[in-house]
């Protein structure tokens, strides 16, 4: 509704009525071959995360804060993958490259929100692991159901209010005649690069949001795991230390991939490297690989989730 009102009140600014998503730059002639692996990743992401939600919902033993966080991560994964993959597959299969301005800005906002939701959920999970390992006796009194809902409610409010500025500022730019985006989704930089007026405010806003949201999240995650590592190194029992590190390993692998790709994309964009395919491909993979990998990594590492999976699939 906000975007529609803004679109109507500023209709004179738009000389184009739609954008054209060109797909993967530099490989237009054979990019359709990417559709099969991308479709398989999307189906895997959907089925695996829906299965995680079913398991957590059905198994009373999994009605605990740690699994609530995992369920929230699964919902973010489903939302992120579904925001981009249907349109990408439509481009690759049916050459359906056009997207209205409103749809483009809505997709831009949804992508930012779901990525931020994943980031903030990783923060909550890192804090959960810190309390479980470093303050085990106080865990039941600190990490309660109330804490889970308050923490995620605060993060959702923070993300939605901060990130609404991204599509609003993009919608205020003047788009004169060029409407072809060398991308397969409506990225902020890809869209605003088509504007024929000063877009510095968009770039500044993007940098500020990256530092305040992603930067603060990453800082809290690093602090949490640094404190965990410090506590583990002080343990006298090698078995207990090994168990604690094993619990955190899967978290760290996924977090490392999540933030490393974001940093690489930012570097290639900010330095103006003449490799447009790389940031576009990384952007797409970053939005579909974690949703596919997250449930598998956590399910394989967690005994309770595996048992719940066997029950749901009637394997025991």
Swiss-Prot record:
Disulfide bonds, paired cysteine numbers: 104-196
Secretion signal, residue range per the UniProt entry: none
Protein origin, superkingdom: Eukaryota
Principal location class: membrane
UniProt topology in membrane: Multi-pass membrane protein
Transmembrane feature ranges: 33-53, 62-82, 107-127, 147-167, 204-224, 245-265, 280-300
A GO MF label: G protein-coupled receptor activity
Keyword Transferase on entry: no
Pfam families: 7tm_4 (PF13853)
Locations listed in the record: Cell membrane
Cytoplasmic side: 54-61, 128-146, 225-244, 301-316
GO cellular component term of the entry, any: plasma membrane
Extracellular side: 1-32, 83-106, 168-203, 266-279
Keywords: Cell membrane, Disulfide bond, G-protein coupled receptor, Glycoprotein, Membrane, Olfaction, Receptor, Sensory transduction, Transducer, Transmembrane, Transmembrane helix
Glycosites: 10
Protein family according to the UniProt entry: Belongs to the G-protein coupled receptor 1 family.
PANTHER family: OLFACTORY RECEPTOR 56B1-RELATED (PTHR26450), OLFACTORY RECEPTOR 56B2-RELATED (PTHR26450:SF26)
Function: Odorant receptor.
Protein's UniProt name: Olfactory receptor 56B2
């Amino acid at each position: 509704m906000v975007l529609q009102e803004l679109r109507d009140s500023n209709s004179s600014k738009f000389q184009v009525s739609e954008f054209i998503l060109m797909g993967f730059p530099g490989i237009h002639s054979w990019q359709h071959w990417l559709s099969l692996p991308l479709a398989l990743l999307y189906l895997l992401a959907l089925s695996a995360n829906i299965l995680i939600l079913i398991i957590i919902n059905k198994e009373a033993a999994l009605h605990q804060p740690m699994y609530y966080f995992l369920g929230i991560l699964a919902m973010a994964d489903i939302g992120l993958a579904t925001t981009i993959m249907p349109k990408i597959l439509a481009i690759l299969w049916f050459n359906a490259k056009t997207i209205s301005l409103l749809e483009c800005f809505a997709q831009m906002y949804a992508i930012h929100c779901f990525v931020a939701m994943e980031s903030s959920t990783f923060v909550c999970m890192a804090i959960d692991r810190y309390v479980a390992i470093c303050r085990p006796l106080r865990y039941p009194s600190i990490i309660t159901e109330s804490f889970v809902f308050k923490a995620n409610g605060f993060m959702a409010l923070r993300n939605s209010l901060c990130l609404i500025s991204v599509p609003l500022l993009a919608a205020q730019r003047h788009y004169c005649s060029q409407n072809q985006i060398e991308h397969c989704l409506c990225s902020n930089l890809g869209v605003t690069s088509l504007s024929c007026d000063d877009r510095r405010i968009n770039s500044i806003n993007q940098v500020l949001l990256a530092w305040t949201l992603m930067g603060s999240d990453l800082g809290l995650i690093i602090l949490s795991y640094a404190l965990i590592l410090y506590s583990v190194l002080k343990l006298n029992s090698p078995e207990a230390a090994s168990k604690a590190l094993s619990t955190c390993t899967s978290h760290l692998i996924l977090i490392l991939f999540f933030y490393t790709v974001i940093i690489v994309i930012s570097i290639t964009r900010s330095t103006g490297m003449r490799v447009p395919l790389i940031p576009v491909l990384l952007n797409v993979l970053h939005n579909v690989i974690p949703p596919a990998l997250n449930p598998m990594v956590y399910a394989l590492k967690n005994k309770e989730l595996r048992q719940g999976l066997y029950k749901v699939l009637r394997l025991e």
